[in-house]
């Protein structure tokens, strides 16, 4: 009976965090709008081989992540939940692997349940796992690969080992088709310390070739298909998206070596108090094969991405699967022997909640700031933000009431965040970062437009997805569409600032022309170097400028 209650509680937990509130949050640009539009165009065109954005070739990533996103929109429709359904599904599948692997290592159902809840409630897992990017997909394939490798190395028969390595190759192949060749590097780096300490080189060399073969066979059908359709895809994807992105001096998202230290700290909330003890206990028990495996799984990718020049928080998402297992194991030991770390965790959550309450007041209309984040008419959003941090502090306090038994309730600290964050976003943020909000405010003006031009790829993708059209024209800036715009058949999809006046004269009689520009809050629209417009509608950071036929 207790198991049934736990199962019902887990489903309720998942519903409150990962299902019910998702539709209340508008899509963020540039990431969510980009992936939403790529998948919408895939469904509309029926082209499941070559990814396109705004009707242009888009070679930033391979295809598998777009497939899953497209299936989400096909099943649930072109709405906020449909766009995020794929990443939520991937996050829940990863959670299932965490549950299974914990059971496999320790044969303890309670420990497996705790690892599950810890993983689902980690701030970084929740933030990325409900955000429509490709990282939850690659995290799933990496976690599946680590589970497959362990399964292979623990098998006692050649059939079991062969099956495990074949499965490893499939997961690596799907990882390559999701985000590229890092899906090969990360698992190899993660298992090498364990293989070395356990002296399992023989099995690796005997059966490893099976993983290579299954990986190649997994990638080969699509790899050949896109090479035939677009011969320069692999050249661009390998050199630009891998070498330049991570290794060269002009790598994207450059950051210092220590970049991931604050990411790990913030990402570990509301379980930050368990982080030092989990890592230390894991190191102290490094003679235990499973502990070494989890430590290597956590630390090696972290070191790899720290050395790389290009860094983003999303890159280390897969590390938190193993970290959640280490945390759950350590938490049970602490609850039994010395609950000091659990008390510290409770106080950290209280401090975080109280700090958030104070910070919310400071940036509210009633605080000391001359330019508050929220305006007076947005008072309900301020109260939503206060509620988020109040619930965080409350559950932090509750875990201290009988810490040996109540410490798992720290998983409820982010409950307010999950339920209310969509209602607390300030209008000034929504107007710049949520194109849906802009479209809603300017729907009547946008719909009849013959041409729509914009200077932001993220805004362009948001307009295209909301209006169900892929013919948005880039104005002045090409951004990440630069490569796709270089193709001969992309002529006319970009208009420079110097060419705009002539272009306007040539196309004005064809219908309404709408220009959507991103501007600074204090920027004077009249100073823009554009021809006089027939209508101007400013929505904080975005401005709609229209030209009608004469």
From Swiss-Prot:
Catalyzed reactions: 4-amino-4-deoxy-alpha-L-arabinopyranosyl di-trans,octa-cis-undecaprenyl phosphate + lipid IVA = lipid IIA + di-trans,octa-cis-undecaprenyl phosphate
Keyword Transport: no
Subcellular location: Cell inner membrane
Membrane topology type: Multi-pass membrane protein
Protein keywords: Cell inner membrane, Cell membrane, Glycosyltransferase, Lipid A biosynthesis, Lipid biosynthesis, Lipid metabolism, Lipopolysaccharide biosynthesis, Membrane, Transferase, Transmembrane, Transmembrane helix
Chief place of localization: membrane
UniProt EC number: 2.4.2.43
Any Gene Ontology CC annotation: plasma membrane
Protein's UniProt keywords contain Cell division: no
Annotated transmembrane regions: 7-27, 81-101, 111-133, 137-154, 165-185, 204-224, 255-275, 288-308, 315-335, 346-366, 382-402, 406-426
InterPro entries: ArnT_tfrase, Glyco_trans_39/83, LipidA_mod_glycosyltrf_83
Record-level Gene Ontology MF annotations: 4-amino-4-deoxy-L-arabinose transferase activity; mannosyltransferase activity
Pathway as given in its UniProt record: Lipopolysaccharide metabolism; 4-amino-4-deoxy-beta-L-arabinose-lipid A biosynthesis
Gene Ontology biological-process annotations: lipid A biosynthetic process; lipopolysaccharide biosynthetic process; protein O-linked glycosylation; response to iron(III) ion
Family, per entry: Belongs to the glycosyltransferase 83 family.
Primary role: Catalyzes the transfer of the L-Ara4N moiety of the glycolipid undecaprenyl phosphate-alpha-L-Ara4N to lipid A. The modified arabinose is attached to lipid A and is required for resistance to polymyxin and cationic antimicrobial peptides.
Record-given protein name: Undecaprenyl phosphate-alpha-4-amino-4-deoxy-L-arabinose arabinosyl transferase
UniProt organism field: Escherichia coli O139:H28 (strain E24377A / ETEC)
Gene: arnT
């Amino acid at each position: 009976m207790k198991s049934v209650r736990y199962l019902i509680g887990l489903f309720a937990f998942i519903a409150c965090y990962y299902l019910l509130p998702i539709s209340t949050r508008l899509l963020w640009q540039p990431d969510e709008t980009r992936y939403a539009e790529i998948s919408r165009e895939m469904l509309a065109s029926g082209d499941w081989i070559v990814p396109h954005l705004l009707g242009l070739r888009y070679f930033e990533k391979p295809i598998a992540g777009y497939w899953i996103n497209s299936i989400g929109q096909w099943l649930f429709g072109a709405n906020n939940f449909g766009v995020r359904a794929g990443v939520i599904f991937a996050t829940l599948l990863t959670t299932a692997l965490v549950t299974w692997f914990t059971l496999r290592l320790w044969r303890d159902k309670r420990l497996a349940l705790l690892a599950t809840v810890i993983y689902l409630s980690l701030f970084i897992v929740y933030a990325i796992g409900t955000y429509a990017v490709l990282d939850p997909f690659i995290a799933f394939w990496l976690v599946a690969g680590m589970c497959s490798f362990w399964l292979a190395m623990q098998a006692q028969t050649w059939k079991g080992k062969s099956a495990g390595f074949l499965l490893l190759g499939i997961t690596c192949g799907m990882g390559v088709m999701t985000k590229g060749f890092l899906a090969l590097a990360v698992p190899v780096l993660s298992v090498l310390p364990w293989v070395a300490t356990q002296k399992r080189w023989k099995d690796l060399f005997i059966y490893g070739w099976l993983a290579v073969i299954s990986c190649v066979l997994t990638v080969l059908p699509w790899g050949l298909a896109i090479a035939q359709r677009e011969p320069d895809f692999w050249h661009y994807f390998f050199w630009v998206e891998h070498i330049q992105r991570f290794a060269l001096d002009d790598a994207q998202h450059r950051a210092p070596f220590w970049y991931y230290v604050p990411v790990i700290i913030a990402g570990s909330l509301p379980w930050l108090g368990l982080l030092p003890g989990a890592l230390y206990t894991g190191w102290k028990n490094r003679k235990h094969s499973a502990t070494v495996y989890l430590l290597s799984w956590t630390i090696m990718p972290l070191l790899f991405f720290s050395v790389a020049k290009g860094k983003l928080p999303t890159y280390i998402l897969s590390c938190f699967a193993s970290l959640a297992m280490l945390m759950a194991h350590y938490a049970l030991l602490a609850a039994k022997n010395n609950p000091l770390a659990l008390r510290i965790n409770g106080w950290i959550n209280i401090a975080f909640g109280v700090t958030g309450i104070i910070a919310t007041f400071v940036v509210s209309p009633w605080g000391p700031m001359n330019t508050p984040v929220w305006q007076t008419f947005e008072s309900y959003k301020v109260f939503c933000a206060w509620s988020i941090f109040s619930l965080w502090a409350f559950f932090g306090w509750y875990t201290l009431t009988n810490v040996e038994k109540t410490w798992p309730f720290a998983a409820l600290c982010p409950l307010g965040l999950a339920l209310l964050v969509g209602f607390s976003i300030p209008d000034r943020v929504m107007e710049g970062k949520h194109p849906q909000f802009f479209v809603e405010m300017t729907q009547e003006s946008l719909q009849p437009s013959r041409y729509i031009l914009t200077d932001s790829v993220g805004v362009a993708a948001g307009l295209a997805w909301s209006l169900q059209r892929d013919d948005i024209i880039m104005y002045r800036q090409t951004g990440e569409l630069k490569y796709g715009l270089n193709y001969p058949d992309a002529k006319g999809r970009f208009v420079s600032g110097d060419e705009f006046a002539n272009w306007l004269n040539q196309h004005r009689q064809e219908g309404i022309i709408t220009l959507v520009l991103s501007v600074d809050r204090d920027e004077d629209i009249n100073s823009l170097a554009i021809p006089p417009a027939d209508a101007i509608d400013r929505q904080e950071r975005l401005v709609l400028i229209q030209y009608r036929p004469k």
